[in-house]
């Protein structure tokens, strides 16, 4: 004889922990630590200026893709801040490095154009155009650099800005999520190019105004 249980059916629900804009805070802390640790690893050395580019700069976009714009920017910023404190030889102006990291994470997180933040790319693009204008304008109008030389000298920054502003940012996000390994590789290359270019632009404009 079987007896059916009576009473209200119970359901087990997993409680979410603390989050930053939907991203678990543990992820934010972990990836910020990764960025900080990679500050010790040189990616390239600039002999003329006596400084090096740390490998942490290569993962700024990756953090934004994983965590999203807000949490990604926070993790990159905190990681970069800790990085310049423990590896000061990798920066010229700490504030510039941190600002560049924050903007790279924010831009990378805004690439897919989905969700309630699908429109964030627009004000961010306007801000980046202003930053680029200040950067190139300082060279042309204050320091007398030929406009074509200023554009060629900032070609990485300008191309990254165009790739972000144009619908190519959506294409890059689609390729990153593709099951095709070749498309993923192209998306990773272009996405890293965009993030690195935006990071450099936002950091360089501060450095350029301070020293020029």
Regions of interest found by a model, annotated:
Residues 1-212:
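Loop-helix junctions at membrane interfaces
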């Amino acid at each position: 004889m079987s007896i059916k249980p009576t009473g209200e059916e119970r359901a087990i629900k997993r409680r979410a922990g603390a989050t930053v804009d939907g991203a678990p805070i543990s992820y934010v802390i972990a990836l910020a630590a990764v960025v900080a640790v990679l500050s010790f690893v040189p990616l390239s050395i600039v002999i003329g200026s006596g400084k090096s580019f740390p490998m942490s700069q290569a993962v700024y976009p990756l953090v934004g893709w994983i965590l999203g714009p807000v949490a990604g920017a926070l993790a990159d910023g905190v990681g970069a801040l800790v990085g310049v404190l423990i590896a000061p030889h990798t920066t010229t102006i700490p504030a510039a490095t941190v600002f560049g990291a924050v903007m790279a994470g924010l831009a990378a997180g805004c690439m897919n154009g989905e969700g309630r933040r699908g429109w964030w790319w627009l004000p961010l693009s306007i801000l980046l155009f202003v930053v680029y204008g200040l950067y190139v304008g300082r060279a042309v109008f204050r320091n007398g650099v030929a406009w074509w030389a200023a554009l060629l000298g900032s070609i990485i920054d300008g191309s990254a800005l165009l790739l972000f502003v144009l619908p190519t940012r959506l294409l890059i996000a689609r390729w990153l999520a593709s099951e095709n390994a070749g498309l993923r590789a192209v998306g990773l290359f272009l996405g890293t190019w965009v993030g690195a270019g935006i990071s450099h632009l936002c950091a360089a404009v501060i450095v350029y105004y301070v020293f020029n």
